[in-house]
């Protein structure tokens, strides 16, 4: 195994194999313990895209609050699934299929288009035009503003969908979908998450569809793998300690180095990671 590969695996806590049922239990218990530790928190708030990661995380959230209601008799424990479309989203049917399957306690819908467009317009009147890529990051951050507004109104925690295959590549928006309170699937790679969804009986389409962040107007539904230049199969193999091609390993390690700032708090004078 490559030295850098071992370092990354240790940092992201990825196991070479998992028992899906055990990891489901671990994630649910983690969510329950967090809510019970902070007795002012009663809700879990999660944005639902209709992809694998939010579907899995939503199922874990719903199971956690259902068990808490049963065990404590406190019916204030709730899971709020949030749809956050930019206007009309092409994956709306998938998102609603996921929400229906997870049987969320509540569903809220916030159209981020007016706020996003207003922000873009306000910035552009005072400076240079905002690129389509930059606008995509604004969309991601507007979605988190909405989720935190809901969580603040409902004594809630915002739940993240970040996992090891995203963490290693930094494939999320800084202070966008990377800005959450709790990440129950953080240690898992992509195929391990799919195995957990299969264990939970989720519709195959939701975890076999092509993953996409779908943030760019100019390149709608751009596959993650096209944006990253490496397959999730190779990322998962790498994180599980298997051999991958030199090209794939170098690509993964390059992403890991370039996106180190996303896995840290804001840089201060004592930090050295950015110099490595």
Curated annotation (Swiss-Prot):
Family annotation (Pfam families): NAD_synthase (PF02540)
Annotated positions binding deamido-NAD(+): 141, 174, 181, 261-262
Reaction catalysis annotation: deamido-NAD(+) + NH4(+) + ATP = AMP + diphosphate + NAD(+) + H(+)
Listed GO MF terms: ATP binding; glutaminase activity; metal ion binding; NAD+ synthase (glutamine-hydrolyzing) activity; NAD+ synthase activity
EC number: 6.3.1.5
Positions that bind ATP: 47-54, 161, 190, 212
A Gene Ontology BP annotation from the UniProt entry: NAD biosynthetic process
Listed pathway(s): Cofactor biosynthesis; NAD(+) biosynthesis; NAD(+) from deamido-NAD(+) (ammonia route): step 1/1
UniProt KW keywords: ATP-binding, Ligase, Magnesium, Metal-binding, NAD, Nucleotide-binding
CC per GO annotation: cytoplasm
Top EC class for this record: ligase
KW Magnesium (keyword) present: yes
Record-listed Mg(2+) binding positions: 53, 166
Assembly: Homodimer.
Function recorded in the entry: Catalyzes the ATP-dependent amidation of deamido-NAD to form NAD. Uses ammonia as a nitrogen source.
Similarity comment text for this entry: Belongs to the NAD synthetase family.
Protein name: NH(3)-dependent NAD(+) synthetase
Source species taxonomy: Bacteria, Bacillati, Bacillota, Bacilli, Lactobacillales
GN (gene name): nadE
């Amino acid at each position: 195994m490559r030295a850098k590969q071992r370092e990354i695996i240790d940092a992201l806590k990825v196991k070479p194999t998992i028992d899906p049922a055990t990891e489901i239990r671990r994630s649910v218990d983690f969510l329950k313990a967090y809510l019970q530790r902070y007795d002012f928190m009663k809700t879990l708030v999660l944005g639902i895209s209709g992809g694998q990661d939010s579907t899995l995380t939503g199922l874990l959230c719903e199971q956690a609050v259902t068990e808490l209601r049963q065990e404590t008799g406190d019916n204030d424990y709730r899971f709020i699934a949030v749809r956050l479309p930019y206007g009309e989203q092409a994956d709306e049917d998938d998102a609603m299929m996921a929400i229906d399957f997870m049987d969320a306690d509540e569903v809220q819908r916030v159209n981020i288009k007016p706020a996003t467009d207003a922000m873009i317009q306000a910035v552009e009147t005072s400076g240079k035009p905002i690129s389509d890529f930059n606008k995509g990051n604004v969309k991601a951050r507007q979605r988190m503003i909405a989720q935190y507004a809901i969580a603040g109104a409902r004594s809630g925690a915002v739940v993240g969908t970040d996992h090891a295959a995203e963490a290693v590549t930094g494939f999320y928006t800084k202070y966008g979908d990377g800005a959450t309170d709790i990440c129950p699937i953080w240690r898992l790679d992509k195929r391990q998450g799919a195995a957990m969804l299969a264990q939970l009986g989720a519709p195959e389409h939701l975890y076999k569809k092509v993953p996409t962040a779908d943030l760019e107007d100019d390149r709608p539904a751009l596959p993650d793998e096209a944006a990253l230049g490496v397959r999730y199969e190779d990322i998962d193999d790498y994180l599980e300690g298997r051999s991958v091609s030199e090209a794939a390993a170098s690509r993964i390690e390059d992403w890991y180095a370039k996106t180190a700032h996303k896995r840290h708090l804001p840089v201060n004078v004592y930090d050295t990671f950015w110099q490595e």
